[in-house]
């Protein structure tokens, strides 16, 4: 039996069913999950473990440390940058322990030689935005106050980067906006930059890339429309600031990001329907005085490096250069 077409039936494509109470039923059979890997092994790019964040919200995180930091009795005192990575899924699907995200974060930890903190967040429509943003900020507080041994021994609190893929890129962007007003409260954590990997943005008016890629088989506009309908606050449209950062000439907080000298890396694929809006957001940030590094790859669909490990090497090299340019 063939896979459902995203164009013909976006709900079937997403494996979700609307319920009368406003929730959705998710069929997660296409999203295999994996356990953390706490024991060092030459086969694992990173060791990892799961830790609770807020038990009342059932939020937690997966912490990754490069295997090189613990293999062969290595007790190096080298402090590593912290990459806070928010997973994708249109705010309605997926989880920290999904195999694709676990493998991606493990390789980020190894290739960037960084501690990766991948927090969970509450999903919509059961918890509409800004719930995910609240949880994303709370994860920063967790890092700041954590007594975890990996954090205490290896984390460089002065070099924190917010990163995310798709909805996670949107989340990293909005957590960054929120954080500009709480720099002193976050101390000793110091955010140095945002790494927005194929960030999930949208607007009411179709962009040229959305029109060109209307029949995209990965993440077409008809599918992202459903995701926004389920995740945005009730009664708003896609020109809300959560989905469309360019509305009203953007947030005034972007200028604060510029003054704080946080750098931003905007990563996109030319075959992603969202590419034009991603470029528009990058242009807006530059206008507001933010230093933006843009990395766009021809032929790449939405989330290409998550889906295809062979595409990660070039991406990780670019991100590594970006981080080194900030340190």
Curated annotation (Swiss-Prot):
The UniProt entry annotates the motif Involved in the stabilization of the negatively charged intermediate by the formation of the oxyanion hole at 87-89
Record's catalysed reaction(s): a carboxylic ester + H2O = an alcohol + a carboxylate + H(+)
Query: Please, what other remarks does the record include?
Result: Gain-of-function mutant (T-DNA tagging) exhibits increased branching and decreased sensitivity to ethylene.
Which residues are the signal sequence here?
none
Asked if the record carries the keyword Hydrolase, the reply is: yes
Q: What is this protein called?
A: Carboxylesterase 20
Catalytic residues? 166 (nucleophile), 272, 302
**InterPro entries noted in UniProt:** AB_hydrolase_3, AB_hydrolase_fold, Carboxylest/Gibb_receptor
What this protein is reported to do is described as: Carboxylesterase that possesses esterase activity in vitro with the synthetic substrate p-nitrophenyl acetate (pNPA). Binds strigolactones, but is not able to hydrolyze them. May be involved in the regulation of shoot branching.
